[in-house]
Amino acid sequence: MGVKKKREMQVAALTVCHQDMETLRSFADMEGKNLASLLLHCVQLTDGVSQIHSIKQIVPLLEKVDKNGVCDPAIQSCLDILAGIYFSLTLKNPLKKVLASSLNGLPEVFLTQATHSFTFHLQEELDTADLYSYRKVMDNISSCMENFNLGRASVVNLLKDVLHFLQKSLIEILEENRKFAGNRIVQTQLMSDLLVGVRVAMTLVQKVQGPQGSLWNDSSSPIWQSMCGLLSIFTKFLNDDDLLQTVESTSGLAVILFIKTMFRPSEKLPGLISSLLLRSAECTSIPEWLMNSCRSLCCTDVPASTLLFLCQGTLAMLDWQDGSMGPSGEALLLDIVHVLFTLSSQIKESTLDMFLSRILASWTSSAIQILESGSSGLKGHLNGDSCVPRRLLEYVYTHWEHPLDALRHQTKVMFRNLLQMHRLTMEGADLATDPFCLELTKSLLQLEWHIKGKYACLGCLVETLGIEHILAIDKTIPSQILEVMGDQSLVPYASDLLETMFKNHKSHLKSQTVTNTWMDKWHETWVFPVLSVLCGGNLDQRSYVIDYYLPRILNYSPESLHYMVHILQASTDTGTGSCNHRGALGALMACLRTARAHGHLQSATQAWENLVCSARVKQGLIHQHCQVRIDTLGLLCESNRSTEVVSTEEMQWVQFFITYNLNSQSPGVRQQICSLLKKLFCRIQESSQVLYKLEQRKSTPDSENGSIREQPSVTLQQYKNFMSSVCNILFEALFPGSSYSTRFSALTILGSVAEVFPDPEGNIQTVYQLSHDIDAGRYQILMECFTSTFEEVKTLAFDLLMKLSSVTAGQFQDSEKLQDLFQAALELSTSTKPYDCVTASYLLNLLIRQDALPAVLSASSPQQLTRGAGETSAVLERNTLVVIKCLMENLEDEISQAENSLLQAASSFPMYGRVHCITRAFQRLPLNDLRLASEWRPLLGRLLLLSYRLSTVVAPVIQSSSPEGLIPVDTDSASASRLQLILNEIQPRDTNDYFNHTKILKECDSFDLEDLSTSVSNIDSSAEVKGKEEKACDVTAQMVLACCWRSMKEVALLLGTLCQLLPVQPGPESSNVFLTVQQVKEIGDYFKQHLLQSRHRGAFELAYTGFVKLTEILNRCSNVSLQKLPEQWLRSVLEEIKGSDPSSKLCATRRSAGIPFYIQALLASEPKKSRMDLLKITMRELISLALSADDSKGRVPQVHALNILRALFRDTRLGENIIPYVAGGAKAAILGFTSPVWAVRNSSTLLFSSLITRVFGVKRGKDEVSKTNRMTGREFFSRFPELYPFLLKQLETVASTVDSELGEPDRHPGMFLLLLVLERLYPSPMDGTSSALSLAPFVPFIIRCGRSPIYRSREMAARALVPFIMIDQIPSTLCALLNSLPNSTDQCFRQNHIHGTLLQVFHLLQAYITDCRHRTNADFLQELSDVTACTKAKLWLAMRQNPCLVTRAVYIDILFLLTNCLDRPEEGKQTALESLGFWEDVRRIILESELIKGFPWTFKVPGLPQYLQSLTKLAIPEVWASLAEAKGQATAVPLSFSRLLKSSFPEVRLLALDTLLERARSSEQEQKEPLPLLCSMGEELLLLAMKEDHPGCFCRVLKILYHLNPSEWLPQTECYAHLSPKEFLMWSMDIASNDRSEIQGVALKLASKIIAYRVQSCEKNKDSLAPELRQWVQLVVWSCGDHLPTASRLAVAEVLTSTAPLFLTSPQPILELQGTLSLWRCVLTLLQSEEQTVREAATEIVTTAMSQGNTCQSTEFAFCQVDASIALTLALAVLCDLLQQWDQLEPGLPILLGWLLEEGDDLEGHVQSPHQGEEEHIFEKSEVNFWAETLTFVKSLCRQLFHLLCQSGWQSPHSQKLCHLQRIASEQSHLISQLFRELPLSAEFLKTVEYTRLRIQEERTLAVLRLLACLEGKEGLRAEDCPREWRQVMAPRTEAAC
């Protein structure tokens, strides 16, 4: 990029009339030195900027004129002309302000004459009668009052006339506005004029009030009458809801200002305004003039908005400073806030909410002003403990989570001002000890961190009280805040609070400490927690900390960088990180990157030399964790200086990075890589410009020595070489078969190169030009990118080709090639593969833009199209027109054929491809600048007709109510007859009998056109697939459906694109009209028909896209008839929905199909700044219909209304405008759920789900109700007050019926939705004592809902109860619930009641235990003792006295919770709980349970599995306790793990095994000896493994054995399992090869551990293990197969990681070479897996393999966590090194060459039958590879083999295997050449799959032949002999790690 040009100021030049010009000429002197000459010269200039300089010379010229010049007629005329010029200029023209500024310095002698001139011209302005010129006059009045003495004087002179004009103009504009009701564009302009008029009147009164104050007091003067008239107008505006709210709010300001100006005595003004606001004014006490002007404000009820704007005016227009209004002013201030509090409960519209919050914030500022003036009267009212601040706090707490950011900001302002008010009332007291502040701090800290308002308020407290006070309460607060920074929605708030805190803390420490030791404390508090997060936090948390927090702390304390580096460097060796954690290396790179980007590192050299070594940088560039790689790249690329020179090391590292990171799977990572590299390229370009200038200066004769002179040129050459090398890598990455991510990255980076280094213009030098590195081969590579199945790749390639236009032009010289390309594009445009038409559109657009159409096509264009052919835009338009005509001709023929046979069209020429190409051609045209209008008009008319014809052909399938994709064929006559009813509904245009009669097929699922042709006479050879294929294409349902809905989709998009040719003028004679009004209406009718009647979602979703474009344009259209169309369409469809006419074609199923989309499009396009009248009308109608229970019209209108409401509540474009209707929607959903009609219930459920998401947000947490998706009851019911009585009443009704007889359990299904809402509400600790919207009334009803006969409802009631109970009320609630349970002696009780109550106890107790961890031990244990005592009283519920297993299970779960949080009594100590006999009771329950005494039931008993699980969970801790008491002695215990494992119930065995597995796993991880218990259980485990038939238990047994040392149990297999160790191994391998995935993986790991143990324990007799080893290797290879689940491949990776030192890298190979290489091939296969988890696991194998003693020198990345992309190369490097160590080159090389060649690949079969299965999978183009790239593996292997041969100097003996490979490779090369010749022209586009496969195999074959050629007869190989594409990415292995 070159130096940016400074933007030139554009100023419109002033002009004068002819008469004034003649006047100036007549007075101008010959020398041109008088004022007339100066003005004449000025007006003759055409440049406004030059005129500004002339105007500035006027006053200096007049200052030189003597006093006699006053009478000079020339000067008088000139001043008059200047006045005329001033009033002729527009308000925004800079000339106007310059002229006013200059004339302010006019000599005094000329002021009188000038004032007269300005007054005269202002009078002319005021006499204007044209309503549409009023705005200009108002602007002139406003500018006269704006720092312009002459203007103000002229306004004062004409004050009466000015006021009269304002009064007249406002009345007339308001009347005009009413006339244009419905025309939004005109109304918006008129209301803008009204707003300006009101503001001008206010300015006038404020500016003139001083010098003309007496004018306002004379009630008989015309000025007074005008003032009263204006006041009356403002009052009318204030009450007019049809005006914009800005007009209303400004009128409120004006009303108060005028009353303040006119009312006398002023001392009574506060009382008057107070009476108006409180609606307490007496008509008799109000002055007559005020009553006449503001009667509606004085004597009638006024809307809430009017009161709100009057409060705003009062606060803004009265003088609150210095307490000048006295006690009455203070009383008024308090009255205002009470009015505002009242309004806050009434106002629900979001815009008024916003006004209210601003006004309340303004009120707090006014209160502070009065308090600062020393007022004592308000101190009692504004102290923190008084009523007003408490109400303000409630407002803050209610709204601090509001969806509107601006409103949340106002709550922060209010809170800060409230603290300031409290401080002022305290008169210097210490706030740190103030009870109000202490209570506020405590309550805020108790809140959960997901509440956004907490952060802002805490920040205000820190600013007021200081951070020390808060840290003293809880010093872990910094860590707590960092913990929540994983949530993106909280990150900005958290980082702001942290910044406030650490700044305050540093200032405090600095002021308190003399020495520098305070810095260590500050680092420990604020920096060290950040480093902990960077090293080990979760991914989102780390990213957000780096982006939001780290820059702030470094910017504030740059010296902390050295502390960070010191800490991280010390831990880098032990914390390199992994795929899941960054480690210290990642944290180090993040800190350095941030520091450099923000200028805290002076240069890159400083970083490399002093802070981090180069080896660390290189490790970071290929680290397994993507963010570490990004941060390291950012460290290299980012700099705060855009011209900083890029060092040689940086360029080398970037080149290294690009080589291995193009194939990133994460879109976010790819975007960051491309963005960072673009920054680097910009740095290179910018610094190169500096270097060029430096070089030019150094080349002068007086320059310094030569070494300095050549330095810039050396760097520039390095830049050029670097850029060329980067582009080489990028182009080589676009090889055949490269993945989507590689192509995307490479093309994006190449596009950045082309953008940053454009072709030079003029004298600008550029260091690199991409076009110089583009040859024909690379151009072809870019063209082949069009064949990608991903459109992003096509777009990037197209854009890049456009940037290389100079190169592109040279590639289209061959006319034959052009013809082939164009023909290929046409053929692709009618392909049955949907993505082919996209390729066709790109090819056609490329040919169009390069003026490269075939000669035959160009010759057919009319002569007049050649005009302007030299211009790019003209060429583009001409070529587009020609291509569209060509496509339309083909489309017309195809539509005609489709009208005869839709089947033939679907199979041979689906028409949507043609339409797609036409649409894409239009989209790349500048539709607002078409020149060939006479050609376009008839073409567009014809195109519209074609679109409608096509739509008519495919509509029967799309609009059918039959199942989507139906083709009316079947295999038997009975089924076929049932289809006839559906067929009768379809009215197609096919002339054959396809849609008229069902067909019976013979043993096939598709319908062959040849079969059809035998029975239908008018189908002949046209039934064959276009393209002269040998076999006719079977037509599947998918093909017909795809043809139809894609055709509808493309027609919709085309029409939407054509709508951009609007705006339309009504007259057809206009030259730039392309669409007539009638055509636009037809397009709208088309969309209406298909949106309202289409059944197929794919069709109406895309029709919606096109319709949205139309409605958006219509709403902006100046044509009134078109502008009103959306409203007409909306009212029409609402009437049709309400009518419920049986003949209506509206779809009542499929969620009303396209109807919601239709209404969405009409409403979403309504201007957001309007009053949203259409939305209001629609929502009222729909909610009324949704709530309607009238069965007389059926339920169809209600279903439609519910479905449409659901769509509207989901539409984010409606924003806060939809919120006022949430309450109505919720009522409709809850009531609709009780409907007896299924369709209503279904639609109600969907609507309810949308409302929950709209109100509570998208679910982010894993739990059912995440904390971030909850809301306090106060906030919820404040926003939706109607729902409070509704929900309470509904819940009361439901709760009163839960005890109904069992025969009617579902009488109130609405309970389900009620509880779903209520479980998302919770009481806030900040709610205070206010009970107006308390949640307490809901609690008894929720508890009662727990008695529901429906299990699910009882569970929901239990969960819903938890958030309603405050944490300190839970113990008492638990006791009350437990006491309500029946006693064992009670005769009559219901188990449903017991179960519901126990569930509530369980969930409450669980929440209490979780939240009470931070409470003092004494309180917690005492409360828990009370709960335990109540629980113990109902112990019979856990015994056999209770026959219900379900309730027994829940009671036991409660006991389990209690046992978990209570410590067992130790010997010699007796706790309070022990005295209760709690532990004895628990033990008694277990010992008397069925676990000991046996089970009398079967699985048919309800609740048995649940009971068994609960009982076992309670028993297992008791088993451990018994074992601990026994202390290893062989004592008989009544319950043991052996007994549990022998249970006949899998639930019991499963839990026991899980416990043992957890202990075994922890022992292994901690590298401890296994527990004696586990060692002694070998017998039970082996027996269980042999006989276990439950998959889950069997899997866990195998896992336990795997985690135990085989030496502990393997020798016992013969005794207990009756299998020798060898047989047990074979048994485990057999399971691994036959069983299900999880078991298979565990068995494989177990077998691998056994075989490793046997190998290590049988060192002297390893040969005997050979058969087992071979079978194990085969099993591992088989387990890598793609046909197996991911778990299988992950198990293989784990196995190979653990056995790598033994089988992969052992200095003395244990396996045969073939077996060892097979395992290595498995590693390479896993590294190329499409699944990221598998690749990451495979990299662990490589890390282990290259970190052994004999391999750590093979690479420079030993012991490093590396990414899979480079792990492949490193694995091959280690393997080649091992072959050399093992001296196995001769037998190993043919095997590796065989990997290259892939022997056995049926190449010819793949190419000759490419369409196998094509009919069934029309959307699949080929095997899509998202990661694996065959040629990447080929290049890496070739590179390593060549390096190995060069390094070893190995001479190839004459090998039979190598000769065999030579022969196969040669034959394959010949076959490939032959197959290439058989492909058609442009095969890369027409036969992409086959072409790509051949290219890949060609590369593989050539690689083998090259290597074999190198081996033949060459004794010494050199590295430079290696092919460039292999050599370029060879990683050096010389640099040692740090």
Curated annotation (Swiss-Prot):
**Which terms are listed as keywords in the entry?**
Coiled coil, Phosphoprotein, tRNA processing
Q: Which GO terms describe its cellular component?
A: endoplasmic reticulum
Q: Which GO terms describe its biological process?
A: lipid homeostasis; negative regulation of endoplasmic reticulum calcium ion concentration; tRNA nucleoside ribose methylation
Q: According to the lineage, what is the superkingdom?
A: Eukaryota
Q: Which residues form a coiled coil?
A: 877-909
Query: What job does the chain carry out?
Result: Together with methyltransferase FTSJ1, methylates the 2'-O-ribose of nucleotides at position 32 of the anticodon loop of substrate tRNAs.
* Protein family according to the UniProt entry: Belongs to the THADA family.
Stored PANTHER family = THADA/DEATH RECEPTOR INTERACTING PROTEIN, THYROID ADENOMA-ASSOCIATED PROTEIN
Question: Any idea what this protein is called?
Answer: tRNA (32-2'-O)-methyltransferase regulator THADA
Query: What organism is the protein native to?
Result: Mus musculus
